[in-house]
Amino acid sequence: MQSNLSSFNKIEQKINGSRKISNYLIGGMLSIGGIGFILAAISSYTGRDLLPLGNPSTLLFIPQGIIMGAYGVIANLLNIYLWYLVFINFGSGYNFFDKDSQSVEIKRKGLFKDIEVKLSFDEIKSVKLDISEGFNPRRRIALVLKGRKKPLPLSGAGELKPLLQVEEEGARLAKFLNVNLEGLK
């Protein structure tokens, strides 16, 4: 979440989506692996080596070739889905806070349509820091809304910033919105 202060009365935070290096690496590995498994399955069926490494033509088509073909098809389906998410930049968007109009606008790129939430400052109860350490750590800033049990997350999914930076951003936002900051122990 990159914070850009255009003036003292407005805050705009850009949220990064699925265009991350890790998604490009996983997509590349899935592409190579899926195509490799399909070529190995075709090689075992036709008896000709279509891969430069190994000797897949010696594999029995039933059951090894069929299983490798199924793995290749599954990998390529996952690969198409992942590249689609990267192409549309799933999860990207922005958070916009405006003191002049007392409004908050949260916009994210969804799978099939954009998600847009507009709130007034009166609907915001507090800013919450959701911090959990361990095997699957999470450091996220969220808005606690009046009349809603679950907080509305502001940070992008998969962002793991230093704890001090998350606390500073949460405190700055709580001060800007003139609400309490929850989650600090």
Curated annotation (Swiss-Prot):
GO CC, alphabetical: photosystem I; plasma membrane-derived thylakoid membrane
GO biological process annotation, one example: photosynthesis
Membrane topology type: Multi-pass membrane protein
Compartments, as annotated in UniProt: Cellular thylakoid membrane
Alphabetic keyword roster: Membrane, Photosynthesis, Thylakoid, Transmembrane, Transmembrane helix
Pfam families associated with the record: Ycf4
Membrane-traversing stretches: 21-43, 65-87
Record bears the keyword Transferase: no
Summary of the function given for this chain in its UniProt record: Seems to be required for the assembly of the photosystem I complex.
Family named by the database record: Belongs to the Ycf4 family.
This protein's name: Photosystem I assembly protein Ycf4
Protein's organism: Prochlorococcus marinus subsp. pastoris (strain CCMP1986 / NIES-2087 / MED4)
Gene name as annotated: ycf4
